[in-house]
């Protein structure tokens, strides 16, 4: 009889615990649903970093502040030997690479603070000291490749073309010639010594699908910021428009 009482007591304990666990599970499920509904129905950030609910954008902004505070403009990304670079560089994204593009008429347009616009040919850019960088190119989708690029340091380019006042601004913006793709980049990142205006890949001229005649290579950022086929560059103290930030991605996208 005593053994039966013990068994009944144990069974009641298990039943009570199961009931409590069941209630907690459904409370958590309900709380998760309410949180999802709150996020889903929250207003969108309709600024230049739109395309995402405001609470999520605020979270990304906090991440951006942390990454910016930790960023050291003079710290170099790890580089590799040229023999480690892949021969077949992955092509990812063709927005802004208009097939009707006429390379023979292309000139880089640099819009200065005073309203003047510089128009610079590829041959003129190639007269500046050449810099090569071999690094682990990282895509925000999760893949990476060791790649080899050649061109002109952005900081050298800025000095050569008298952009001292522009370099005091907080951001640089870049567009493709057809203005279909565009990025905004914080000035410390674009002045980092490994950031180049790139005209070579694996020791040869850029292919069309990699942004010929000139693209941006910025090793401290994910691939979405490495704009292919630069048409124009401008400067601002406000965040420039950014294609993927407008579609819900992080604006800073550094790593």
For each of these PLM feature ranges, what is it?
Residues 20-38:
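N-terminal export signals
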Residues 15-18, 36-255:
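Structured, non-membrane catalytic/scaffold regions adjacent to prosthetic-group chemistry
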Residues 1-14, 26-29:
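N-terminal secretory signal peptides
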């Amino acid at each position: 009889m005593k053994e039966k009482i013990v068994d009944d007591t144990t069974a009641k304990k298990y039943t009570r615990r199961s009931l409590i666990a069941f209630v907690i599970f459904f409370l958590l499920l309900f709380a998760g649903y309410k949180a999802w509904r709150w996020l889903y129905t929250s207003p969108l950030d309709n600024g230049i970093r739109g395309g995402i609910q405001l609470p999520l954008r605020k979270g990304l902004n906090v991440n951006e502040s942390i990454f910016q505070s930790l960023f050291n403009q003079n710290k170099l990304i790890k580089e590799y030997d040229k023999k480690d670079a892949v021969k077949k560089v992955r092509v990812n994204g063709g927005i802004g690479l208009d097939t009707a593009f006429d390379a023979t008429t292309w000139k880089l347009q640099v819009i200065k603070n005073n309203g003047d616009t510089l128009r610079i040919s590829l041959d003129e850019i190639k007269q500046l000291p050449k810099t090569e960088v071999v690094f682990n190119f990282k895509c925000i989708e999760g893949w990476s490749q060791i790649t080899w690029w050649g061109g002109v340091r952005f900081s050298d380019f800025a000095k050569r073309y008298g952009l001292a006042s522009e370099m005091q601004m907080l951001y640089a913006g870049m567009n493709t010639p057809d203005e279909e793709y565009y990025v905004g980049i914080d000035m410390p990142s674009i002045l980092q010594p490994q950031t180049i205006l790139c005209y070579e890949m694996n020791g040869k001229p850029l292919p069309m699908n990699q942004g010929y005649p000139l693209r941006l290579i910025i090793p401290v950022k994910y691939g979405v910021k490495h704009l292919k086929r630069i048409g124009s560059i401008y400067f601002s103290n406000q965040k420039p428009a950014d294609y993927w930030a407008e579609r819900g991605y992080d604006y800073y996208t550094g790593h």
